Every structure is written in structure tokens, then in C-alpha cells.
Amino acid sequence: MKNYYNVILILLLIIVTSQKLSGQYVTFGRAFSFGDAFITDKDVTHGFLLSLTGGLSITYADNEHYGFAADVVYATEGSNSKTAGVAGDIQNKIKLGYIRIPFKYIRFLGEYGDPIRPKIFVGPSFGYLVSAETNKENTKAEFNKFDMGLHIGVGANKIICDRIWLNTDITYTQGILDVTKQSQNNNEINLNGSVRLNISLLLGTKRK
């Protein structure tokens, strides 16, 4: 838990410092997303698992067409799967909680001041595990503390009023590190994945 607070303090410091950069465009505010999460496993049938995130977001752009963004969010992830058994299907629900920090390199389309600006982005995503349950039992010891993945997305930013932006996008995230600890009973590579709709309301430091 102490490490969790240290991560939050460091990232808040980064956010505050970023607002003092000499670039022209900085927006910051709250972010929320929902979608489907899964863990890759070739021997199971995947079902829907609601994945939610909530936290803070900041975007910095030194010109009107390219920028960088970072979020600090709590994310619920995991999988809802079925495995064929002798007596029938075996249901397995894994719920993972992460402090997740996705970074984005963004390409903005259109011009600054347009009422709607489409965008595309890509970047890495880092996660720190804070909770894990398998079928409602605590299984945190079976999962690795750190996770990393890549994400890509498309979306649009809309001006609500002066300096207030509504940001929406659809993001696909694919893990690249095994989320489970290797053992004699588990030697497969299991990767996090998710598809989410992201919504954030951001305040800009520059008038349109």
C-alpha cells in the first residue's frame, strides 16, 4: 500500500509540473472508461467481463497536431471464462485491480479551435497490481505485481465551452507480460487484454 501512495504522489507531481511547461496546449481533468476485459488462454471460452477505470488525465501538446497524454487510473481487469470438464463446463472468474498508467502519443486531426477534433494514438501502459480474486477467493499471491502492455485507439475531442473539452475514444490494450506466476501447474503465458470506451472531461489552460 505504501508503494501505491508513492506512485500517486510522484504522478501528481508530474501533472503539476507539466502545467508549467512552455508549450501552448495543456488540458487536465477526470477520466472514466468501461468495456470488456480478458486474459488470453487458448484452452478456454471467453465471456464478457465488465472492466471499469477511473482517475486523472493530462494532455500536453507543443503544437496543434501532435501531443502526449498520460492517465493515472484505478482499473478493474481480469477474465470471465469457461473450460470444458468431464462433468460439464467449469466457470472461472478472475478479478484484478490495478493502478494503471497509460501513456499516449497523439496525432490530432483538424485545427485547434475546431468544434470537433478527431485523433489517433498509441503508447505503452503500465500497471501495478493491488488486488486479485479468483472465484471470490484472494489469489493475489498467484499474480505478478507489475504489468505492461501496448494500447492503440481512435476518438475525438469536442469543445463544450471555452477551455472545456469532452474527450471520447475507443482503446484496445494488449498486455505483453505474463500476469500469472509460473509454477509446475501453470507454465502458460497469460496476457491481459481489454477493449474500452473512454470518456474524460478536461480543462484547458489556453483559450480556444
Language-model segment annotations:
Residues 28, 120-124, 168-171:
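Extended hydrophobic secondary-structure segments that form protein cores and membrane-embedded regions
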Residues 32, 59-135, 198-208:
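Gram-negative (and chloroplast) outer-membrane scaffold detector with strong preference
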Residues 40-44, 86-93, 136-142, 182-187:
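Extracellular loop and loop/strand-boundary signature of outer-membrane beta-barrel proteins
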Residues 21-60, 200-208:
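Short glycine/proline- and aromatic-enriched beta-strand/turn motifs that initiate or cap beta-hairpins
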Residues 71, 76-82, 115, 147, ...:
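Predominantly the C-terminal beta-signal and adjacent terminal strand-loop region
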Residues 1-25, 205-208:
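Cleavable N-terminal export/targeting peptides
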